[in-house]
Amino acid sequence: MRSIARRTAVGAALLLVMPVAVWISGWRWQPGEQSWLLKAAFWVTETVTQPWGVITHLILFGWFLWCLRFRIKAAFVLFAILAAAILVGQGVKSWIKDKVQEPRPFVIWLEKTHHIPVDEFYTLKRAERGNLVKEQLAEEKNIPQYLRSHWQKETGFAFPSGHTMFAASWALLAVGLLWPRRRTLTIAILLVWATGVMGSRLLLGMHWPRDLVVATLISWALVAVATWLAQRICGPLTPPAEENREIAQREQES
């Protein structure tokens, strides 16, 4: 448990570098970012947004199983644990959002530029909020259509970031489960992807840096427990002797 907690803590620290740096810098979101950067951020965030998030989940689960070489029974147990970790994280996120009720950056911007009081905005039902955003931004040339559509769908509260929790959970699961097998490329790709998802939430006006920080910390706690459970139920996560030889050979060739 301690080794898993240490590994995932290092991964969480790496994920926290970007949002903490942005937080300290005092950066504030404003519409009108470079179009190519904004479009790239949108497509990165779409890898987590439904329905694509389900596809991402299934692809990553399949890859994890291949890397871990689990038997069928153990595979189903691991799938249940991984799915539970993601679902519990999303449930915790929803509960905190309802309690804290922090407005999104773009909602604050709507209040300043379109005179829509934040309190009144959030008293509306979700569908009504989406329609209001659509009406108010119909003539807004500085906001691309894809971003307007995204805002119409994402009219909930900001704190903490659900997209960050999804991506960070997978990245930290990689650190916890795949590091003993030295799947360093997979770990690096997922850490970069998770950081990209976090950055996209800032650029799209969906979250504040603190939303990302807290979401990452929650993900770390959940993943530490999930990997511990996986080890208790499925057995040691360390590779057997035969696989250790293969890992050593792979490292020599790289």
Curated annotation (Swiss-Prot):
pH effects: Optimum pH is 6.5 for DGPP phosphatase activity and 6.5-7.5 for undecaprenyl pyrophosphate phosphatase activity.
Region (Phosphatase sequence motif II): 160-163
Entry-linked PANTHER family: PHOSPHATIDYLGLYCEROPHOSPHATASE B (PTHR14969:SF54), SPHINGOSINE-1-PHOSPHATE PHOSPHOHYDROLASE (PTHR14969)
Entry's Gene Ontology molecular function annotations: diacylglycerol diphosphate phosphatase activity; phosphatidate phosphatase activity; phosphatidylglycerophosphatase activity; undecaprenyl-diphosphatase activity
Transmembrane domains' residue ranges: 2-24, 55-66, 72-94, 162-176, 183-202, 209-232
Region (Phosphatase sequence motif III): 200-211
Pathway: Phospholipid metabolism; phosphatidylglycerol biosynthesis; phosphatidylglycerol from CDP-diacylglycerol: step 2/2
Superkingdom of this protein's organism: Bacteria
Keyword Phosphoprotein: no
Gene symbol of the encoding locus: pgpB
Side of membrane Periplasmic, spans: 25-54, 95-161, 203-208
Catalytic activity reported: a 1,2-diacyl-sn-glycero-3-phospho-(1'-sn-glycero-3'-phosphate) + H2O = a 1,2-diacyl-sn-glycero-3-phospho-(1'-sn-glycerol) + phosphate; a 1,2-diacyl-sn-glycerol 3-diphosphate + H2O = a 1,2-diacyl-sn-glycero-3-phosphate + phosphate + H(+); a 1,2-diacyl-sn-glycero-3-phosphate + H2O = a 1,2-diacyl-sn-glycerol + phosphate; di-trans,octa-cis-undecaprenyl diphosphate + H2O = di-trans,octa-cis-undecaprenyl phosphate + phosphate + H(+)
Provenance organism: Escherichia coli (strain K12)
Gene3D superfamilies found in the cross-reference section: Phosphatidic acid phosphatase type 2/haloperoxidase (1.20.144.10)
Residue ranges of the region described as Phosphatase sequence motif I: 97-105
Location of the active site: 163 (proton donor), 207 (nucleophile)
Record membrane topology: Multi-pass membrane protein
Role this protein plays: Catalyzes the dephosphorylation of diacylglycerol diphosphate (DGPP) to phosphatidate (PA) and the subsequent dephosphorylation of PA to diacylglycerol (DAG). Also has undecaprenyl pyrophosphate phosphatase activity, required for the biosynthesis of the lipid carrier undecaprenyl phosphate. Can also use lysophosphatidic acid (LPA) and phosphatidylglycerophosphate as substrates. The pattern of activities varies according to subcellular location, PGP phosphatase activity is higher in the cytoplasmic membrane, whereas PA and LPA phosphatase activities are higher in the outer membrane.
EC number per UniProt: 3.1.3.27, 3.6.1.75, 3.1.3.4, 3.6.1.27
GO term, biological process aspect, one: phosphatidylglycerol biosynthetic process
Positions of the record's site feature: Stabilizes the active site histidine for nucleophilic attack: 211
This protein's UniProt keywords: Cell inner membrane, Cell membrane, Cell outer membrane, Hydrolase, Lipid degradation, Lipid metabolism, Membrane, Phospholipid degradation, Phospholipid metabolism, Transmembrane, Transmembrane helix
Name by which UniProt lists this protein: Phosphatidylglycerophosphatase B
PTM remark: The N-terminus is blocked.
UniProt similarity note: Belongs to the PA-phosphatase related phosphoesterase family.
GO CC annotations, alphabetized: cell outer membrane; plasma membrane
